[in-house]
Amino acid sequence: MSVKKISEAILGVGVDDTTIDLFESQYPVPTGVSYNSYVILDEKTAILDTVDNRATEPWLANLTEALAGRKPDYLVVSHMEPDHGANIARLAALYPEMQVVGNAKTFLYMDQFFGADAVAKERRVVVKDGESLSLGTHTLTFVLAPMVHWPEVMVSYESSEKVLFSADGFGRFGAVARFDKNADWASEARRYYLNIVGKYGPQVQALLKKAAALDIATICPLHGPVLTGDLSKYLNYYDLWSSYKAEEPEKILVASASIHGHTKAAAHTMAEKLRAKGAKVVEMDLTRTDVSYAVTEAFRCGRIVLACATYDGFLFPPMETLLTHLKTKNFQGRTVGLMENGTWAPMAAKLMRAELDGMKNITVCDAVVTIRSAANAAAEAQMDVLADELLAK
């Protein structure tokens, strides 16, 4: 990414990272990720956020080009997480007259990351919810957004151009240069939201209510493309995702964790039975699918079938991983069917139910499919019963 002109006064100076394989050291990003940063040029010059250490040098080059000899007056810190805040201390050292804008928690975390001497007290501008900063013809109003998805997060609204600088909100996996505007924005925005921010639905809902009072023409997130045009579709997605409602309530996810293939084969048979009854079904092999994709599909669907082998008296680990992630992300309000396999002591259904009992408003079907080694006619009969119960919910 080079300098991107968002308007005459607002420039994007972010950087694409196409060599990263795992975002937050856990989420695959096959098309990379962007670290976005912005500059507002007015009587006063403001930089909004820095970038990850992986992108420091190209970001500084973009910044130098955008500033064109100016010295920045302010650095606004929306989010202290290192993929955005890693270069705060370096920028403060490069521009010793620059003031740093954040809220009280921003500076608490800044001191924890860099030490209290990185940004001297007299250089700090501590803002509260609803306070504004005039740059000249441009004015930034700060809206605190705690736990979207860190406690110190705040977004900034520029009123003259109706721009919302949304921090991690409305972010998306994928390098911006590789994003086709005709492509599906929601696919990787959904996976980003549900895995990064998904736990904090009530906090996102609160922020959406604040945003509804603003006249927004452009959204500038810290990851992914700048959003313009009809913004209602993006806002509607966020309203849906943060409410924990199923995006496709009639769709069923059949997810299997199979050691030698027999549980997966049984899960496929179950999926085919559901399809034969008119259901829309997606199958996922948890041993071959990263958990972030499975979490995303689980939230997207209204009903789920979990098929798992028993392993050393516990759940086969890929299923345990999925259930742990779902619980962490506040998964709720779904109907779940259970299938278990075990050659001598099948226990997976009991163990999965125990995990699901710790989640909110989860309905577990009474019918359970129990397989001993490989599915037979008796197991298939149980599948028919489970399919009917699941579709009746």
Model-inferred region functions:
Residues 176-180, 184-219, 223-226, 269-284, ...:
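FMN-binding flavodoxin-like domain, especially the glycine-rich phosphate-binding loop
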Residues 43, 54-101:
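Active-site metal-binding motif and surrounding structural segment of the metallo-beta-lactamase
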Residues 4-8, 102-153, 200-206:
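Metallo-beta-lactamase
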Residues 255-277:
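Short, charged N-terminal beta->alpha structural module
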Residues 3-65, 155-158, 162-165, 263:
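Conserved beta-strand hairpin/beta-sheet module of binuclear metal-dependent hydrolase folds
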Residues 48-50, 72-80, 99-103, 164-168, ...:
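Active-site neighborhood of phospho(di)ester-bond hydrolases with catalytic His/Asp-centered motifs
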Residues 220-248:
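Short N-terminal or domain-adjacent regulatory/targeting segments
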Residues 87, 290-294:
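Short acidic active-site motifs
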